[in-house]
C-alpha cells in the first residue's frame, strides 16, 4: 500500500522527438531539468563482499521527456530508477527530483510508480484499487470519483470500474495500474518494464496507448525495458547502460516525428536508431 502511494511522472508528444526533448510544446518551461543525477554510485554490501551496482552515473532529464533505460540484465536499470524513487540510497553522488531530494519528492508525491506486475489488490474492484492512494491522501468521495472516471478514460477502461482484477486481461490490469499511478496527477511516471510479461500483440497495443496517454498528459516518463523496438518506438531519449558495474554507455536521441504508428518500425529512420542502440549494447559488453 505504501508503494502504491509513492509516486508518478509527466509526459509529452510534439513536433520532432528531438524537438520535443527541448520544447515539448510548452515553451521554455520544458527546458527545466526535473531529474538531475551527478556522479552517482551505489554499492551493495553482501556476505560475499561489495557489489558495485552503479558507477559514476550522470544524467539530466528535462520536463516532458520520455526517457528509456535499456541494457542487459543486471546493468542497474531498475536500481537507478529505484534511486530516483527513494527506494534505494546511493553510496555517493547526488540526485534531485524537481529540485528536491528523492525522499522529499516521494513525500510530495511528485511521481507515480508502475511495476512489472500490475500489483492490484484482488479483493478490491478496479475503482477501489485506483481510489486507494486518493483515500490515503484524503480526497473526498466526489473528488475520488471524478479522478477515477478521468483516468479510466485515459487508459480506455471506462465501464470496467466495478470489475475485479481477475476479471480483466493482463494488459487491462496494467492499464488499471497506470490509471492508479496517474490518479493523484503526479509530475512524472516511473515505469519498470510494465509490459515485459505480455505477449507481443498486447504489448504493441499498450505501447500505442502509452504514447497517446503521454500526448494527453504531457508527463515526464522514465521507462525501463529490455526491448530495443519498444525503447525506440516510445522514447525521446534512450539511455544505453552497460553492466558490472552499471554505468551509462551512451545516450541516444530519438529524432522521430510525433506521429508514431506501429508501421514506423519498418522505416529507415527507426531502423537506424535501433541499430545504434543495438551497437551501443554490444560495445558496452565488449568494453566491460
Tell what function each PLM region has.
Residues 70-72:
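The feature captures the beta-strand-to-loop junction immediately N-terminal to the Walker
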Residues 85:
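Helix-to-loop junction immediately C-terminal to a conserved catalytic motif
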Residues 93-103:
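Conserved ABC transporter NBD signature motif
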Residues 124-131:
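Short coil-to-helix segment of the ABC ATPase nucleotide-binding domain corresponding to the Q-loop/switch region
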Residues 135, 142-160, 212:
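Conserved ABC ATPase "signature" region
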Residues 163-166, 184:
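Conserved signature/switch motifs of ABC ATPase nucleotide-binding domains
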Residues 189-192:
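Catalytic Walker B motif of ABC-type/P-loop ATPase nucleotide-binding domains
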